[in-house]
Amino acid sequence: LHYPLRRQRQMCIRDRDKIAHIILNRPEKMNSLPVSFWSDLPRIINEIDYDALARVIVISSTGKHFSAGMDLSVFSNAENARNKENPQTDPGRKKGSFYKGLLKLQETFNCIDNSRIPVLMAIQGGCIGGAVDFASACDMRYCTEDAFFCIQEINIGMTADVGTFPRLPYLLPMGLVKELAFTGRRMFANEANECGLVNNVFSNYEDMMKEVMTIAKEIAKKSPLAVWGSKEAINYTRGRTIEEGLNQIAMWQTGMYNPQVDMKEALSAQIEKKDPEFEAVSYTHLRAHETVLDLVCRLLLE
């Protein structure tokens, strides 16, 4: 795998065993999320999603804390951009610009939801503010005993706005979400585990990463098409009825599933007592500098 982000070493990417490992690497800044992060992360996730060389994404960080959330430079940069792009004094236009900018920030974590690849997050120390938005978008979360989660925005006089509230009520009881949101208190690892926010808690960082990578390797062995279908079906059920969920998976199976391919490979591998080899689900038909829309148009004309 060869992904382009190397700028200022704010994030590193490693790849092994069909696992793309994204590492936040600003320990001296408590891995706060700078301006570049908000465009770099979706670009990287989308690239991994498109080339399909990786079957799982793991996100972790270096240092004592997972992340202190949005870097203060994002706030000042947004204000400067609004003043530069909207020199007019009309408050409606200024607020409209702010609204569009906020939607753009929200897209950063939407890419995790929209990716067909499972995203696992490993958390140590503080997961604060925007990092909670980040974590709530992931498919699975694991943490160390010293981890804590804090909806920090309320403590600085604002409302969390890039993903916490649309997602956290699907992960935690509503009353608990409101308590965390209204008080800004810290939820520590044992409480997060008891409530189901994290899948497991580990005594130290090394044990956590070892187990997370073991789980990622197990997922990577499965049919990428079946994993994709499972993620789509599970995410689709949010806010929908059982009937709607059943209809969605029925449509998926009749449209995507072929028992002569992945099921045949899985059963043969079990009989032969070996790991199955599933074909990747990639966008390899894309030509250089061609978008997905370009590809669709080209195929329609061929």
Please tell me what each predicted stretch does:
Residues 185-191:
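Acidic, divalent-metal-coordinating active-site segment for phosphoryl/phosphodiester hydrolysis
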Residues 61-108, 157, 241:
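Glycine- (often His-adjacent) and acidic-residue-rich active-site loop
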Residues 1-9, 13, 285-302:
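Single conserved hydrophobic/aromatic residue that forms the stacking wall/gate
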Residues 180, 233, 252-257:
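Helix-loop "lid/cap" segments that line or gate small-molecule binding pockets
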Residues 142-147, 198-247, 260-261, 278-283:
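C-terminal long alpha-helix characteristic of the crotonase
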Residues 7-10, 14-62, 283, 287:
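Conserved CoA-thioester-binding segment of acyl-CoA-metabolizing enzymes
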Residues 108-114, 122, 128-182, 195, ...:
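CoA-thioester-processing core
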